Amino acid sequence: MKPWILLLVMFISGVVMLLPVLGSFWNKDPFLDMIRETEQCWVQPPYKYCEKRCTKIMTCVRPNHTCCWTYCGNICLDNEEPLKSMLNP
């Protein structure tokens, strides 16, 4: 066997084995860019608000709601409702 063929085979096998280790062979997961970082809720909501959960990408389905974290996990909190319930005894 000619020496340049042996070198070519060794080079190709080395590149094929090295690509998955470097991590450049696969594309990045597109859902990681969509996930938002949640902030702590600005009020301590009552337990009834723990039923409204955020989606997996930390957004809310309902309009005028914000995803935030509290003692019961990530919840969708209405931007106006907790303040109304705090003002009305």
Curated annotation (Swiss-Prot):
UniProt record, GO biological process: antibacterial humoral response; innate immune response
UniProt lineage: Eukaryota, Metazoa, Chordata, Craniata, Vertebrata
Keywords (A to Z) from UniProt: Secreted, Signal
Misc remark: Although this protein was isolated in a region containing several WAP proteins and was defined as a WAP protein, it does not contain a classical WAP domain.
Molecular function via GO: serine-type endopeptidase inhibitor activity
Signal peptide: 1-23
GO cellular component, one term: extracellular space
Coiled-coil ranges per UniProt: none
Protein name listed in UniProt: Protein WFDC9
Highest rank taxon of the organism: Eukaryota
Localization: Secreted
